[in-house]
Amino acid sequence: MAIAPGGGLYIPPSPSVSDVICLSNCSELRTVAPGGTIQVTGQHLETAEDVSFKADDGRVKAPVKITSDSTLTAKVPDDAVSGRIRVVGSVAAASSPVSLEVDDSIEIGKGGAVKLTAAQTGPERAYQYGNKKPTIDFITTGGGSSNNLRVDVTDEDGQIVRSYNEESVKAGTTESVTWNGRTESGKAAPNGDYRFVVRSIDGSRAKVTSSVRRAKKDGVNPFRFSIYGYKFPVRGPHTYGDGLGAGRGHQGQDVLAKCGLKLVAARAGTVYFNDTDGRAGNYIVINTKGTGGGSNTYMHLMHPSSLKVGDKVKTGQVIGLVGDTGDATTCHLHFEQWSAPGWYQGGSVTDPTPELKKWDSYS
């Protein structure tokens, strides 16, 4: 227990663990040699005091280095063996959902060709200007104790759209490369499927080990992902109602859905208007990013959006809930799309239905 602000006692929250990966002395993402470093991710990890590892005669603890409330690192004790780790907090403990393999036979940087021994890419579907950007985590061995690598992003045709030079990458450590969705010229990459390719700096591909090939056979491609410019705003079951040109000077598309479903920004941008109106109910207007000055409008929200005028919004960020406020006969989102320079800023309304249905098909 601890003293709460203003007096009294409170119980600190219990930690929870979502994943554990190897950071150093690794042969795979979850295979580590004694003395190596692991990273634990989860929630409320700021309350952690130790990481407990399985040992031949029970368990052995190691001190933690807390890097945030959602990540910590720990050094693997010499007498640790394979099994699930436990994060021990001040009032409770939490086990990892996956096992950590501890292997004292790992040999790092023993010469020869650079080998790619582990890789994972996420998210499988990313959005331009979204919260989560395509990222590959990978481990290489062979070559020297450290190697100069090149990581390419290629399109469906194998054409390189972006390259990153990674210098002095230590063999047996987890390296991460994140793509911002831009080509070498700085333009947003078109919708489609992409992949990461890890190479030696001379351009030759790193040799893929059997563990990575097995992952591909199991249907989990550790290199591929897709990226899109927009995300469908209604995050749940829905149907389409009145479209552009329906009665009452209808200037958008109605998407019928249950009240309370989350609404997300179809495209990143800046909040231009956030207000309540007798017809529109609670509504928000976002001037969209990378469109030359267009706007998207979301009407009939259940509650006023918590966002403020001038706030920056990411693609896929929650902006409110489906509602029936204003002149609405049922729960729905009324969505409008305006050309540059935007909503009642000199732009004109455009038919959003074809675009909505396209976003709907992949979101």
Residue ranges and their predicted role:
Residues 160-187:
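Glycine-centered tight-turn motifs at strand-turn-strand junctions
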Residues 34-38, 130-136:
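Structural beta-strand segments of beta-rich domains
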Residues 109-119, 217-235, 256, 292-294, ...:
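Acidic, glycine-rich catalytic/binding loops that coordinate metals and/or anionic ligands
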